[in-house]
Curated annotation (Swiss-Prot):
GO terms for molecular function: ATP binding; metal ion binding; threonine-tRNA ligase activity; tRNA binding. This is Threonine--tRNA ligase. It is found in: Cytoplasm. The gene is thrS. Residues 243-535 are annotated as: Catalytic.
Amino acid sequence: MIELVFPDGSKREFPDGVTGREIAAGISKSLEKKAILVEVDGELLDLERPLEKGGAFKILTREAPEALETIRHDVSHILAEAVQELFPGTQVTIGPAIEDGFYYDFAREEPFSLDDLAKIEQRMKEIVDRDEPIRREEWDRDEAIRHFREIGEEYKAQIIEAIPAGEKITVYRQGQWKDLCRGPHLPSTRHAGKAFKLTKLAGAYWRGDHRNAQLQRIYGTAWASEADLEAYIQRLEEAEKRDHRKLGRQMDLFHMQEEGKGMVFWHEKGLTLWRTVESYVRRRLDEAGYQEVRTPQVLDRVFWEKSGHWDKYRPNMFVCETEEGEELSLKPMNCPGHVQIFKFGQKSYRDLPLRMAEFGACHRYEPSGALHGLMRVRAFTQDDAHIFCREDQIEEETARFIELANSIHADFGLERDHIALATRPEVRAGSDEFWDKAEAQMLAAARKAGVEPVIAEGDGAFYAPKLDWVLKDSIGRTWTCGTIQLDYVLPERLGAEYVAEDGSKQRPVMLHRAICGSLERFIGVLIENYAGAFPLWLAPVQVVVATITSDADDYARAAAAELKAKGLRVELDLRNEKINYKVREHSLAKVPVIAVVGRREAEEGKVALRRLGSDGQQILALGEAAEALAMEALPPDLARKRQDGGVQAGLGGEREAG
């Protein structure tokens, strides 16, 4: 007998080998019809699978959040069946569920087209209507390899050969079609529903290795209901409008090209945005007591061997050899260099905590298929810093950093979704006692800063736990930006020491921390969060002075000069074009303020201000407009310093500072 604990806390015993369907049927016929999976002790199982153990037990319907991943996995199998029906001879490889959807990789000489996707999607719906039963089978390893080779599925045979000896080989039959799979799966294709859509085609390499055969990947999305699917498609359409790669070109911020994969060509306006972000973060770090340093871009192999990166990170490093036989690498991380600066000269306990920051340029090899605009690059700059401290300072320093990171993210207009405490991974360094202590320190520090972190089991670095910031943008997407990680290992490896109060030599603890992470990625997030329509302080061009008639050219030049004198970033548009054309063009470039001047404005010493996204305009004296815009364009940290009695002037009169 096995004992199952139901969600209401009740316990019941069942004979060994009972299935989830039988249990559901014993509760009610309606539940049996709606049930698609069961969960036993945290493990999802097919409805028809005999239960081998007891524990916490749940019957899942398609509305259950836990069921969504299995629905997506089933739809990926339905995709594969549809492709093989429509395009005989196509080999299947792998087809997992992923965030928001699924994909399947196919081996086929002729490329799929967008027209093919529509045909495949229609066939998938027909397969759902067939209500094909889905059943799990355990196969003999050698028989499975032989069978898949006989039917021309070489990739499946290779997958089976790579499965560790002793692990069960399971095949799922879906009507007459079959696939190698661990499961679980739904009772039949009907249960997958039709709330799915194929979204795009892409290339992929077998086993993710560019030296292997190239495959064709079909992506799709699947949801529990049509309403959920429609909402997701709307989010996709909104995200497409905000795509930083498209806006980067449209706004003349940056571009990327084949000759420099994963490298960014920053244009003048993009670099202005970069410098604005960097300058703001630099001021905040300076206020928080950080020393800014700079470490070499290229260091000898011996250095990376000492730090441990050569053994653990070599495939991601860019390495070159000199004529003298030196093996050098571009730095993938800044931390070992910071330890060298810490070691220069004797350090005392009185010097701690020592906060060392660097806007450090790093290079890491990423496969070309993984690159994605500013979000995934090979050359990037981190707002990196390392805090060297005593063990008794960990909690205080971590709490201070949490407050700083929260403040900076808020100033950039990014809402915090949550902070995750990533705990010990399965493969890790250090004893359980060490991990107990380190996790408790991070948790206590978070709570000291007024934060209750979400526990991310097993997501910690191999050497220590960490806190990760998960931010939410204006359309509800989440981005991981910011981290703080404990490290006892690197100071030990590289021989960092300080003189303790009793005169003994001690190892400092090292806190790795970043607020933006990669500046490239952070700027990409900002572009998409604001859809390019930045607040005035971030906008690369804050004001364009545009003329209605050439009679106002001299006045426009004087107006632009006055605005620039107030520290504003200004462009002058004296072209012989209609004003509506100019306004439309600068609006597409997301310029937040257009100061329109014509003959009347020139005579009266005024400007007509048009805001991005607004049809109205505000007529102000030039001096008044310059003062108000300059105040509004102050970065948040400088605006706080300019507070006067809790209010500050703006174009809307008085407003709260902060």
